Amino acid sequence: GLGDVYKRQHMYNCLYDCSYCFLQGMYNSANYLVFVNFHDYQNEIEKIIKKHKEKKMTFFTGYDCDSLAMEPITNFINDFVPFFSRYKKALFEIRTKSINNTVFRKHDPLANCIVAYSLMPEALAQILDKKAPSVSARIKNMKYLANKGWRIGLRFDPLILSLIHI
């Protein structure tokens, strides 16, 4: 398993505005809020890792935002990939729908980093994920990253049972 799981929250709201997403009213404002104190977050993560040296643990991002989509503005992933390269037992998972792969070309692949893509049937995505890259574009990007040595994860999100007739 993934061991203890920690959500890393560096930003609120998402540019993709997917119609089913809980972020559609989660916060008082639809404005983006970016926390820029990455060093403080890294210090806290480091404390957790050192305190629980023998435990498996996963730190993920992409719950309250799409970290990869906003990377050109936040520089978050560029900052955290080198950080996690020092902690091989800690898994860093980046949850995304973005096809922005620029940051991954700047770094060597990490065995403890997973780029996890949310997927659903293309026809459903055209209805629900109108502002997000197409599923086929995401799959193409996953292949590109996998060929470069990055680990890929799949997240089937949302799981909807016949709520929409396609």
Give short role names for the model-derived ranges.
Residues 2-6:
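Short, small-residue-biased leader/transition segments that mark boundaries at the very start
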Residues 7-36:
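Canonical Radical SAM [4Fe-4S] cluster-binding loop centered on the CxxxCxxC motif
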Residues 25-141, 151-155:
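Core AdoMet radical
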Residues 159:
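Catalytic metal-binding/acid-base residues of hydrolase active sites
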Residues 163:
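Catalytic cores of alpha/beta
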